[in-house]
């Protein structure tokens, strides 16, 4: 059966697949569009399986908060190349996955893949269809979901995603000034990279380890090695305070006003708004952190193709 260019263009429009792929699928399907789409989907699934072993360390991080339902989500979806993050279909998929997490509260990524999207397909099916179009390995790596008052912030077009959870009183979270404050705190987390909310949330073993390191440094320093224990203890107390100031969010210097700590800025905003604000927890995702970056080996790729 002869396949017209018009049919090929129509199938390409429906699937976003390449012209030659569309022509081959239509030929195999004897011109039947539904069958051709099915063939392309099947090939997409096979392609996805082949690509699953390739490193996906690019992509984007996304964060969103729904004030109406008081749920916030931060998610990381990885792809093989950085330009995919600018692809509208990829971005739409990330936002749809975020919405599913927000509304259906899956326990983990595996559970998320089985959830259904607004279109009626599972997230897993939507992902495989996306791989068919984009032709890269794409993976949902991780997500965090908070219930309650939140602030969500995305930096650098998806390089960093921040979600901060608060406790408030007197409905102050509904005010525009609180939204601005929440963004400031999320940006603080993005810029200053704290490890903990406050001193109380630092594990005792972490503090003990820091003290151990400080004592070892003193022992190896001729200026401090022979100082009295009481003096060393005072020095360690000062160093621990510095550790807290650098690593605890509320103790950090506020990036937008160096005269204030984050705790002081929070207290000021709470007073101005007529309520109380407590920073409860936060999550900071950086795209691809901890993942091996893709290193292309053209010779190896060609060799694998001719086997």
Spans of features found by a protein language model:
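N-terminal assembly/interaction segments in proteins that build large macromolecular machines
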Residues: 2-307
């Amino acid at each position: 059966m002869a396949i017209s260019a018009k049919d090929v263009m129509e199938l390409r429009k429906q699937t976003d697949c390449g012209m030659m792929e569309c022509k081959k699928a239509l030929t195999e399907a004897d011109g039947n569009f539904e069958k051709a789409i099915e063939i392309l989907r099947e090939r997409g699934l096979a392609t996805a399986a082949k690509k699953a072993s390739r490193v996906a360390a690019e992509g984007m991080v996304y964060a969103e908060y729904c004030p109406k339902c008081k749920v916030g989500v931060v998610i990381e979806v990885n792809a093989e190349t950085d330009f995919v993050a600018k692809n509208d279909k990829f971005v739409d998929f990330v936002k749809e996955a975020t919405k599913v997490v927000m509304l259906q509260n899956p326990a983990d990524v595996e559970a998320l893949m089985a959830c259904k999207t607004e279109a009626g397909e599972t997230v897993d099916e939507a992902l495989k269809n996306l791989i068919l179009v984009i032709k890269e390995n794409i993976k949902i790596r991780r997500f965090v979901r908070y219930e309650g008052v939140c602030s969500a912030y995305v930096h650098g077009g998806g390089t960093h995603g921040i979600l901060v959870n608060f406790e408030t009183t007197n409905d102050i979270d509904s005010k525009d000034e609180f939204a601005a404050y929440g963004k400031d705190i999320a940006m603080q987390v993005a810029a200053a990279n704290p490890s903990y909310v406050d001193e109380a949330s630092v594990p005792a073993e972490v503090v003990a380890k820091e003290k151990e390191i400080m004592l070892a440094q003193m022992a190896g320093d001729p200026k401090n090695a022979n100082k009295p224990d009481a003096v060393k203890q005072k020095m360690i107390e000062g160093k621990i305070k510095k550790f807290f100031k650098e690593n605890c969010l509320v103790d950090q210097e506020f990036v937008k006003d160096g005269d204030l700590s984050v705790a002081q800025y929070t207290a000021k905003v709470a007073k101005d708004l007529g309520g109380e604000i407590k920073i409860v927890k936060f999550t900071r995702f950086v795209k691809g952190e901890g993942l091996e970056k893709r290193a292309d080996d053209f010779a190896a790729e060609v060799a694998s193709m001719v086997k």
